Amino acid sequence: MESYYLDWANLLLRWVHVITAIAWIGSSFYFVFLDSSLVPPESKELRDRGVGGELWAIHGGGFYNPQKYTVAPKVLPDHLHWFYLESYSTWLSGMALFTVSYLWSASTYLIDKSLMHWSSGAAIGVALSFLVVFWMVYDLICQAFGQRKNGDAIVGALVFVVVCFASWLACQWFAGRAAFLLVGAMIATAMSANVFFWIIPGQRTTVKDLREGRPVDPIHGQRAKQRSVHNTYFTLPVLFAMLSNHYSFTYTNKYNWIVLVLMMLAGALIRQFFVMRHGYKLGRNSHPWPYALVGGAVIVGAIVWMKPPLQAAVVSPSAASTSVATAAGAGPGFMEVKKVLEQRCYMCHGSAVQMKNVRLDTPELLKQHAQSVYQQTVVSKLMPMNNATGITDAERALIGQWFRAGAKME
């Protein structure tokens, strides 16, 4: 019954997380586009009011004319819309989902005992420390180098090195699936922390100074803009880290941390293409296509590099006369497979517990799920999760032979 409610919690939290993330990413991408597309106003009246750029656009049958002030307007309106709830809601729902999906069952989903044999409490503590330590290191880098000459390039290079190291470390300490998600959560935490600790406080200071008649220090807007730009480059790498959980060939690869780094780098390069594309149309920067091409080349390179070796075609018992199994005329029997399932699978898919509502402890139910068992246990090797029950390659091969011979139940 507990697994039933956990599945519902997982589904609903995932739904909320996707909804809030769409809202946050959508508004973030829009304002990056807006900043890249602004042109100096032609109207002297607008320039006299302090407007530094404007955009004319049409959408949904209406015309829009957003304007951006160089620093701030002389008088603020009574109602001022703020963009921060999207960020906070995304992080809170994501943290809740991470807790339900991984921390709640750390021994199953977070820990791979072949990598680190530690307690659930220790694994949870270290996982949470990844979120905090990365934010602290990233923030120190930004404060130390962000305002220097070529500060953006220096910060970008240093943060990339830190992300590479964190990816390697996470894949050495945690189960691959959890490691990928943890790196994504680590970066996403820094994104939301940028909003909470820098962007919104700086904007509140600016608004307070305006309302109280004090001169506005432009540094607050500059810092907020810098962190906002960082967030836009973090977005696609985080999305890959989250989506990769559904594709075990990424995080089960021997060099999984390199796979993660390459795909996140490709995401950042592709995001750079979109950022520069708007300015290119206005003649402000060079052609953005090289970034997209390099990003695409990184992805293609990863696909070719990760390509599994060709396997010999499976020969049916009736077609091959040289193998012992063929001579016998049949693959492994049900009782042989049942012994493996009893030791490796029934604790999560038996009469007492049915994770994901999958039960395998009767011939009828096993026959029903035979394709899934073969796919998850033999092809992707995703199950047992993190190999918590210690299934051997020989046992996986036995299940594969049984399935390819027709998954017989006698």
What residues fall within each predicted segment?
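Membrane-water interface of transmembrane alpha-helices
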Residues: 28-39, 132-139, 195-210
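Alpha-helical transmembrane segments
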Residues: 13-25, 119-130, 176-196, 259
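Alpha-helical transmembrane segments and their membrane-interface junctions
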Residues: 82, 87-107, 165-181, 234-253
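Membrane-interface amphipathic/juxtamembrane segments adjacent to transmembrane helices
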Residues: 28-72
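Cytosolic juxtamembrane amphipathic/interface segments immediately preceding
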Residues: 5-6, 65-83, 217-221
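Aromatic- and Gly/Pro-enriched helix-to-coil junctions and flexible linker segments
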Residues: 61, 75, 95, 102, ...
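Cytosolic-side membrane-entry/anchor segment at the start of a transmembrane helix
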Residues: 2, 120-169, 286-288
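Membrane-interfacial entry segments at the cytosolic side of transmembrane helices
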Residues: 148-157, 252-256, 280-296
